[in-house]
């Protein structure tokens, strides 16, 4: 956010992107994917310094980032998920902490609410189910 002095929130309900066959979305998890969480934590700190009323909104986005990272971990083979258990634990710990922010959970879509609650409660089951749901085709 550099030297930003103002933050604006818009009502646009979606986004668009180009699916790059060689892009990050198609690559397996590496520890650098944890940077997505760190970047949103840093962005939140900067945004809240400008407008504290956006805490729930920006935290809901951080929660989605945590769940996207957990999804990357879920796509790994079971042996690799075990090798990356520390990152799974970090995601779970951060998720449980962020779910405590008033209003953040309520701003999530129904799908993200379900995913977040399941991953926070039983991460192994969530990762197993996510892995096999994606590979069933």
Where do the language-model regions lie?
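Amphipathic alpha-helical repeat scaffolds of TPR domains
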Residues: 59-73
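Nucleotide-sugar-dependent glycosyltransferase catalytic core
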Residues: 6-39, 76, 82
């Amino acid at each position: 956010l550099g030297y930003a002095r103002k933050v604006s929130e818009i009502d646009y309900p979606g986004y668009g992107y180009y699916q790059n066959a060689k892009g990050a979305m198609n690559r397996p998890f590496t520890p650098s994917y944890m940077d997505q969480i760190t970047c949103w934590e840093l962005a939140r700190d900067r945004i809240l310094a400008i407008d504290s009323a956006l805490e729930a909104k920006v935290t809901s986005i951080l929660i989605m980032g945590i769940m996207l990272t957990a999804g990357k971990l879920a796509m790994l083979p079971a042996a690799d998920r075990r090798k990356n258990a520390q990152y799974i634990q970090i995601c779970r710990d951060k998720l449980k902490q962020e779910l405590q922010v008033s209003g953040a959970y309520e701003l999530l879509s129904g799908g993200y609410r379900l995913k977040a609650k399941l991953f926070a409660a039983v991460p192994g089951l969530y990762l197993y189910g996510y892995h096999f749901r994606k590979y069933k085709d």
